[in-house]
């Protein structure tokens, strides 16, 4: 005991600064715990550290932010660490969002934030000004082309027939649970690769093979989130020394580039061998209609299209089924609507006893469309976004914005505000999207932000709805899914609103024909 005491005294004499640091850390931790105990209080603004400790110590960022925005009247100032330019304005006020995306659109470009997402390259996602207008015109030409849409619809139907239905049928026969989120990620990866690169990676098979590209894409987005909550100087130093999340990003970047460049090379080689092929994928469209053959340009745009389609659709469908598990009456209404469509359709398509819904059949599925809207409202695939102010401004809420200041706005929080969506905002209620005449109700994009708003509103919105309705209708009509008992659904702390543990389901064949 004496030896131990002597050693402690010697340590304290020679390294007092370490003891002080340890003591400060313990006190800091206790205070942080106390300060964080109130669910809806504004994060405490610490000397030096600002409010950042409250964010870092919380594992449910979206709910954490929602509670504070509700308490503070939809907007509050987030103070970051001193001298590191990390102050934010947090908001879910629709008038502020309308201001940034419509009324004062030019003052909120991608700007510096484009550097955070530099892996996307120089494309419609990161571009501003004339370059962005040029990208958007080309994207509109592609996404609204009849041949492009027909090609996608045909491939999706075939993918359901040859992959999705057999996998769910097998799961039902073997009574083996499947991760529905993983199924949707694989399905949309296959369909997006075909529509962008004319290639089917066949990731959705009975074997559920590893998909290096998808893993790399997820890692890249996580690294981008890390950049958002890390001082710019720090993440740039990490990039320079190739350590931590920046090292992970660099490795993921190589995987992404290797896959896309290889597919572009294969497509070009095929075209060179057989001449111009009758293909309406996005990359071929750029080459044939716009005479653009630059590999870097094609890579940047291909990556954007791939992620946009894969992530939005897969996550929306995943959360929709979770909502149906919690609201079985909604599923019964969808099923009733689908039965009527099948009974009245002259284009009934069955294969091995399973009904397949095509793009024509689901046009009249109003309640299903409303259910998708409700899933997108409550569970937006991108729960928050960040804007940079080019010049000083004043938001409609009265908050002053400095030039260069960042604004984080939360569609996730907006969906949970009674003053925006009514007293029943927390209910999953597709009926809110249907008028008294039985038609779909329109909500302004700055309120229903799932597809962005203003000049940057998503060009593929209706196409995305059509594709998701085909898939969801085919699953619900042919199968009854139930969440595995005891499975825990938890949001990931990510730029995307994916489920941390997936969505494990049991599958049973349905007899409705």
Swiss-Prot record:
Enzyme Commission code(s) on record: 1.14.19.50
Residues binding heme, per UniProt: 458
Annotated thermal dependence: Optimum temperature is 30 degrees Celsius.
GO MF term list: heme binding; iron ion binding; monooxygenase activity; oxidoreductase activity, acting on paired donors, with incorporation or reduction of molecular oxygen
Recorded superkingdom: Eukaryota
A Pfam family hit: p450
Reactions the enzyme catalyzes: 4'-O-methylnorbelladine + reduced [NADPH--hemoprotein reductase] + O2 = (10bS,4aR)-noroxomaritidine + oxidized [NADPH--hemoprotein reductase] + 2 H2O + H(+); 4'-O-methylnorbelladine + reduced [NADPH--hemoprotein reductase] + O2 = (10bR,4aS)-noroxomaritidine + oxidized [NADPH--hemoprotein reductase] + 2 H2O + H(+)
Keywords: Alkaloid metabolism, Heme, Iron, Membrane, Metal-binding, Monooxygenase, Oxidoreductase, Transmembrane, Transmembrane helix
Bilayer-crossing regions: 14-34
pH curve summary: Optimum pH is 6.5.
Pathway(s): Alkaloid biosynthesis
GO biological process entries: alkaloid metabolic process; lipid metabolic process
Enzyme class: oxidoreductase
Cross-referenced CDD domains: CYP86A
Cofactor: heme
Localization per record: Membrane
Main location: membrane
UniProt xrefs under InterPro entries: Cyt_P450 (IPR001128), Cyt_P450_CS (IPR017972), Cyt_P450_E_grp-I (IPR002401), Cyt_P450_sf (IPR036396)
Similarity field: Belongs to the cytochrome P450 family.
Protein name in the entry: Noroxomaritidine synthase
Species: Narcissus aff. pseudonarcissus MK-2014 (Daffodil)
């Amino acid at each position: 005991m004496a030896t131990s005491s002597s050693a402690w005294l010697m340590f304290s004499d020679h390294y007092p600064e370490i003891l002080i640091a340890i003591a400060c850390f313990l006190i800091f931790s206790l205070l942080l715990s106390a300060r964080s105990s109130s669910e809806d209080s504004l994060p405490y603004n610490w000397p030096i550290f600002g409010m950042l400790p409250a964010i870092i110590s919380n594992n449910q960022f979206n709910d954490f932010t929602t509670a504070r925005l509700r308490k503070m009247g939809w907007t509050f100032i987030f103070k970051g660490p001193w001298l590191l330019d990390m102050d934010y304005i947090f908001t879910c006020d629709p008038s502020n969002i309308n201001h940034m995306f419509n009324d004062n659109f030019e003052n909120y470009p991608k700007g510096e934030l484009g550097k955070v997402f530099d892996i996307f390259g120089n494309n419609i996602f990161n571009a501003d000004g004339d370059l962005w207008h040029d990208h958007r015109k080309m994207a509109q030409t592609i996404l609204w082309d009849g041949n492009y849409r027909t090609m996608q619809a045909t491939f999706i139907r075939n993918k359901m027939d040859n992959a999705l239905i057999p996998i769910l049928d097998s799961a039902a026969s073997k009574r083996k649970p499947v991760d529905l989120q993983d199924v949707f990620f694989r399905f949309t990866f296959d369909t997006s690769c075909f529509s962008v690169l004319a290639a089917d990676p066949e990731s959705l098979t009975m074997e559920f093979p590893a998909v290096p590209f998808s893993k790399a894409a997820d890692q890249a987005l996580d690294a981008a989130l890390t950049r958002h909550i890390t001082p710019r100087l720090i993440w740039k130093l990490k990039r320079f020394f190739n350590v931590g999340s920046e090292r992970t990003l660099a490795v993921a970047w190589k995987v992404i580039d290797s896959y896309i460049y290889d597919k572009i090379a294969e497509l070009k080689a095929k075209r060179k061998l057989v001449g111009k092929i009758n293909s309406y994928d996005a990359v071929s469209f750029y080459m044939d209609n716009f005479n653009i053959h630059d590999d870097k340009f094609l890579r940047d745009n291909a990556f954007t299209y791939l992620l946009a389609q894969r992530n939005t659709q897969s996550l929306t469908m995943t959360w929709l089924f979770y909502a149906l598990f919690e609201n079985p009456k909604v599923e019964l209404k969808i099923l009733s609507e689908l039965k009527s469509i099948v009974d009245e359709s002259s284009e009934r398509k069955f294969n091995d006893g399973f009904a397949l819904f095509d793009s024509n059949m689901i046009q009249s599925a109003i309640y299903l469309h409303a259910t998708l809207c409700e899933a997108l409202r409550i569970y937006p695939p991108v729960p928050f976004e960040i804007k940079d102010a080019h010049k000083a401004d004043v938001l409609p809420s009265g908050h002053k914005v400095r030039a260069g200041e960042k604004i984080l706005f939360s569609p996730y929080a907006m969906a949970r505000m009674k003053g925006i969506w009514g007293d029943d905002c927390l209910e999953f209620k597709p009926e809110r999207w249907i008028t008294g005449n039985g038609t779909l109700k329109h909500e302004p994009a700055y309120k229903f932000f799932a597809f962005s708003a203003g000049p940057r509103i998503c060009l593929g919105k209706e196409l995305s709805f059509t594709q998701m309705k085909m898939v969801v209708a085919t699953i619900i009509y042919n199968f009854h899914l139930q969440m595995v008992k005891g499975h825990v659904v938890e949001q990931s702390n990510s730029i995307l609103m994916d489920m941390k543990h997936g969505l494990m389901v049991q599958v049973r064949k349905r007899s409705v024909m």
